[in-house]
Amino acid sequence: MQKLILDTNVIVSALISSSIPSKILYELVLTEKVEICLSEEVLVEYLEVLNREKFSKFTNFKTKAEVVLNRLREIATFYQTDRKIEVLTDTSDNKFLELAAVSAADYLTTGNTLDFTITEFEYTKILTPREYWDNYAPKE
């Protein structure tokens, strides 16, 4: 089974609109067709970002976010990150590379191409949601 890491912006996009990120989240992750990799640091970022007031303008955002976060807690494989990595200029995003290193995830999907300027880190390919969906997502 593929191991996948979702950057926070992919989850936000999935909750806001029907799009490729929502297909990844609802059709692959939450149905356990891929293994979602998490660390406490990444989960904390998910919680902080998804609880921002600016998202309250989207219908049922908070409710959908709570459901998704609860489900992720149930199904994710949690990893203890034990290595500090300093590769990305936005240092707050390095936690995703730290998770990639310890989990040996196959893919990290992000919409943040400004900060994620690398396409691979150790064993993990770094892809936009579209690249992942079109080329690597498991198909039934």
Descriptions of predicted regions:
Residues 1-38:
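Short, well-structured N-terminal submotif of metal-dependent ribonuclease cores
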Residues 7-8, 38-39, 112, 128-129:
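A secondary-structure boundary/capping signal
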Residues 15-16, 50, 120, 137:
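Short, flexible helix/strand-to-coil boundary loops that buttress conserved ligand/catalytic motifs
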Residues 44-45, 85-88, 132-136:
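A short acidic, often aromatic-flanked loop/helix-cap motif at beta-alpha or helix-coil junctions
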Residues 74-109:
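Active-site neighborhoods of divalent-metal-dependent phosphate/nucleic-acid chemistry enzymes
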